A protein has these predicted regions:
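Active-site-adjacent mobile loop/cap segments within catalytic or ligand-binding domains
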Residues: 4-6, 59-63, 68-73, 77-80, ...
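Long, well-ordered alpha-helical scaffolding segments within enzyme catalytic domains
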Residues: 25-37, 92-110, 147-174
Length: 216
């Protein structure tokens, strides 16, 4: 199991704002914690980009079994609260969607519908066209002082909850019945190229030597 985390908005788009924060900054902070706690089981998509505006998913090249989660925060009146998961409305929620929805609505209660199917959003459609499993998670309302306080104080709980929804453990813990050797996990990122051809050349060289390589 491997997670591919997209932090919503960015690249000059702050997203929703409220209580002294921007959506883009907060979900990037959460993405960072998911990456830190998830170790080699997590890839954080380039946070300098706006993956909606630049149509990033359509040019994405990752293994088809990677699970994509796009992180957002809701915006409405100051009294609106709650977290939920959005999926492509043409499909049924899977076990991961339901586990995420149960987790996030437990931390951010208030929504009557915790899994919502939408057919009008670009990224769910782009992911489906590429054959990638995808869901968008709204982590409470940035316009709610209560939700923002919970988000900030329980960020690691949210990050761990996301990992656990996919059967993954945070680094340094294990829910598996198998005995594994404890130790640090080191990740290596090789190269950044302006030319896609050069990136593809290096990826091919790494794959020929038996290494897993992806271009993001």
């Amino acid at each position: 199991m491997h997670l591919f985390i997209i932090a919503g908005h960015g690249a000059g788009d702050p997203g929703a704002t409220g209580n002294g924060y921007t959506e883009a900054e907060r979900v990037r902070a959460l993405a960072s914690r998911i990456g830190a706690l998830g170790g080699s089981n997590v890839t954080i998509a380039d946070t300098s980009r706006n993956w909606y505006a630049d149509n990033g998913i359509s040019s994405l090249n990752i293994p088809k079994d990677y699970q994509i989660i796009e992180l957002h925060m809701d915006s409405a009146s100051a009294s609106a609260r709650g977290g939920h998961v959005i999926i492509n409305g043409k499909y049924k929620a899977d076990q991961y969607d339901n586990a995420l929805a149960k987790m996030i609505s437990g931390i951010f209660p208030g929504r009557s519908q915790i899994v919502v199917g939408r057919t009008d959003l670009a990224n769910p459609k782009r992911a489906a066209a590429k054959g990638y499993p995808y869901r968008l998670m709204e982590c409470g309302f940035i316009t709610s002082a209560t939700d923002v306080k919970i988000f900030n104080s329980r960020m690691d709980d949210i990050a761990r909850g996301i990992l656990q929804a996919f059967g993954l453990s945070a680094v340094g813990t294990s829910t598996s019945t198998k005995t594994e050797t404890a130790g640090k996990i080191y990740r290596v990122q090789v190269g950044a190229f302006k030319s896609k051809a050069n990136a593809e050349k290096l990826a091919s060289e790494l794959k020929s030597k038996g290494y897993q390589a992806i271009i993001i």
